[in-house]
Amino acid sequence: MYEYIYWGDEPFISFAQACPSLFDRTITINGVSKSYAMTGWRIGYCGGPSDVIGGMKKVQSQSTSNASSISQAAAIAALNGSKDEIHSMVEQYKLRHDYLCAALNDIDGFKTTPGTGAFYLFPDVTNVIEQKGFADDVELSQYLIEKANVAVVPGSAFGSPGYIRLSYATSLELIKEAVNRISNSLD
């Protein structure tokens, strides 16, 4: 999903590329939602051994409906088209990522590790929880929506209590405002 939203030092490679000897036992799943800014369209695809893909087709055909023909055509155009817009988006995501990472680390109790792609940060807020007397990341997240008017997702929703997820898929101006609100609400 984030194949092109990446700015790490090493080039992105799939598992099949990393372990060619496992190619015939590898299933690669991808989609256009994130890299092509088509979130909500639910267009995905996969590649792998034909017997496994055949089984997946049987399950999929009975459990989900088809994407609209317009969405399918748009996905094909995106996959076959220029990546120039993606590169421009990635530059903007990187700027927002770097700002948000640094700004959160300036807030007492936040510990944010820089990422190499996507458009989320997942800071460790265990010190904030302890210092401010919150029960857990869920209570902190509820507090931030109520007091700072900033929506975050508790890390426990992803199996990582003590963390929160923040998206930077918005303008830098809104990110700065959100950071100020978070900081002010915790002072």
Pin down the residues of each PLM region.
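PLP-dependent class I/II
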Residues: 1-187
